[in-house]
């Protein structure tokens, strides 16, 4: 992706987030974006929208189906994308919207990788640790299970990581023995 395309994507995302923020609708916008991104991930919609083989009329039909129960701001955004023929960038724009919402609200997704599934108490403790150590509000808690960690956990927030896994500790111990 070129710098020009990246700048275009970021500008669309910032504009949408600004409008939603002015109208105190960031939570609604975030829910809309997550629902549409889920549709992208369960279908090959991104490929269809970026394909030159798919006629523009077909792309209009596909995006019209996405409008469903979205907020006015999201539907206006989708109309603008269609009007300016930017369908190929929609997936990246929606991801950029989530990043902008995180920056504006200081609420980031938290990825927790552990050897076993977390209990509700552990999840609430993770949220507290994130708030204290990273000075951010935990957004979605994305839980991953990786038995190779042996024990402990890895918390990842906004490109920052806390790794207390036994696997990492064993690797560090092994390096110290050399």
UniProtKB/Swiss-Prot annotation:
GO terms for molecular function: proton-transporting ATP synthase activity, rotational mechanism. It is a peripheral membrane protein. SUPFAM superfamilies: N-terminal domain of the delta subunit of the F1F0-ATP synthase (SSF47928). Signal peptide: none annotated. NCBIfam families: ATP_synt_delta, PRK05758.2-1. Belongs to the ATPase delta chain family. This is ATP synthase subunit delta. The lineage of its organism: Bacteria, Bacillati, Bacillota, Bacilli, Lactobacillales.
